[in-house]
Amino acid sequence: MRLLLIHARSFSFEVRDKAVENPEPLTEELKRGSADNTLVVFTTVEENDNDSPSFLERVADDVLDVAGKVKASSVFLYPYAHLSPNLAPPPKAITILNALYETLKGKASIPVYRAPFGWYKAFNISCLGHPLSELSRTITPQESAPQRKPYTRDYYVIVSPDGSIHDPASYSFSERDADLKVLVDKEVFKRELEGKEQPRYIDYCLKFGFEWEPLSDVGHMRYGPYATVMLELLDDYSYQVAKSLGIPVFKVKGTNMFRLSDKAISEHAGLFGERMYITESDEELVMRYAACFQQFAMIKDWVLSYRNLPLGMLEIADSYRYEQPGETVLCFRLRRFYMPDLHIFVKDLKEAMDVGLRLHAKIFEEIRRIGRDYVSLYNVSKEFFDQNKDYLVELARREGKPILVRVLEGAKYYWVLNVEYHIIDELKRPREIATFQFDIGNAQRFGIKYRDEGNNIKYPVIIHTAILGSIERFIFALLDTAAINEANGKVPALPTWITPVQVRVIPVSSGYNEGAIELARRIEEAGFRVEVDDRDETVGRKIRDAETLWVPYIVVFGEREAKTGSLSVRVRGVGQVSMSIEELLNRLNEETKGYPRKPLTAPMLLSIRPPLP
């Protein structure tokens, strides 16, 4: 905080116009003011300032010490944004200035006045000109006593499907509770197995073109042609899954940066903490860390009735989180990623709990489709836990196994329930993928309203959810599943619908290129991704390259195939199988049924491509 202290014979001000978009509300007494023999405190609130009592008391003590030395009859607190280049966002500045004003009033034996923040003001000042009449101060929170965090007592319990509640420290874990024990060790006892070797999935990422971008910030990825088609498929699939919940879902798009000067944005950003990307143009902007800002800013302008609820809004949001450089992990913990962020607006908490059961089932359905299962951590407020134990028991019953519950006591959050769905990875570590939470605070913060049956204005409860997790984390889950399968002696593979190349046709010589291309065109016209390896390489080399890419169907095309139409197909994980083109297409249709389709994101013929890294 920067202070310029002027001992004035007289001082007066009068408000003229707005200086920021959301200034401090202007009361009659704040429109103008004056004082004689006053210490005018021109005050700049900086971005690292806070409203901790220890910091504000230090500032107040310094101001009042000067006021006493110059024998001022009053103190006049005057917001002044010209003493520092590092300004706090306006909502934060207003909060701190008002808290400083109250601190000064509480400690001073002389009157304390103030001028409003966020307004252009005309002022007149007559400085007395003695040696102490012009002073400056720079006071930082670090110079004050260490700020204590609010006391909270979080505790953990294990809730069984039969309704019994257990202390994790004395819980008897069975063999089928192995995943739960890994989660309990990490969350409750802060023990976690650290992988000493590089996880196998990293090599898989590089194989498909998921890699770091060295010319960008730490934690930013780039996506090659094969990685791109996987992203696009999951983009479409996320919307498909959201619509399958049976509620109206609106897909939207928007910007990725928002003004911190907006009160709602600033307050919401404050809840997120230190992992925010901040950038500056003419003013301070925050890069969104999910789709919340855009969706809330949009839906607050919609005219909603109880008849419209529940209502979903989805965006595949490019999201930004300032993870520490040493913590970024390819395809898992990133500074920039894609989040299929679904918000469901419901009338009240009861309806949220009903929709939550549907979400819970869908989240488990999707992870089980890829051969995995979740172990869940339920973060709940103490009030929600006390009033809704039966709901948590029902969720455990639907999981079919015990769940870990963290009860947060003494702290206020905008949510009352926040569920984290973890898989246990190849290295036996919990890895959060999907999530949902019940938000009871942000509708009012952003001005999102609906009219109930009695035409009364109400604020909806908001369910935040990522059914698949982020796009990159779902890909991590797919690749980690393949890694576990390979470690268990199985052939690693991806589901056919998301494998970048579903069929590769290999002509045995250049004389069969035309027939191979004709066959590939038929497969392409049926809606599948197919390549032709027409390079001047041996058949053995071509087959090895296709297997390296986990192509599920490799068709070697030669004289017999050209004459008979019977195809020699190498099926991944099975072996050599003879089939007709119709049988191949039937297999592909069956294995991709219910999933989106996308064309290749590279030319069909390998001979015209440069070698991809």
From Swiss-Prot:
The protein's Enzyme Commission number: 6.1.1.3
Binding site for Zn(2+): 292, 343, 464
Record flagged with keyword Lipid metabolism: no
NCBIfam families linked to this entry: PRK03991.1
Example of a GO cellular component annotation carried by this entry: cytoplasm
Protein name: Threonine--tRNA ligase
SUPFAM superfamilies for the chain: Class II aaRS ABD-related, Class II aaRS and biotin synthetases
A Pfam family per the record: tRNA-synt_2b
HAMAP family assigned to the protein according to its UniProt record, in alphabetical order: Thr_tRNA_synth
Enzyme class at the top of the EC tree: ligase
Stretches for region Catalytic: 199-495, 200-495
Domain remarks: The N-terminal domain is an archaea-specific tRNA-editing domain that hydrolyzes incorrectly charged L-seryl-tRNA(Thr). Catalysis of tRNA editing is performed by the charged tRNA itself.
Organism per entry: Caldivirga maquilingensis (strain ATCC 700844 / DSM 13496 / JCM 10307 / IC-167)
InterPro entries xrefs: aa-tRNA-synt_IIb (IPR002314), aa-tRNA-synth_II (IPR006195), aa-tRNA-synth_II/BPL/LPL (IPR045864), Anticodon-bd (IPR004154), Anticodon-bd_dom_sf (IPR036621), DTD-like_sf (IPR023509), Thr-tRNA-ligase_IIa (IPR002320), Threonyl-tRNA_syn_edit_dom_arc (IPR015011)
Keyword terms, alphabetized: Aminoacyl-tRNA synthetase, ATP-binding, Cytoplasm, Ligase, Metal-binding, Nucleotide-binding, Protein biosynthesis, RNA-binding, tRNA-binding, Zinc
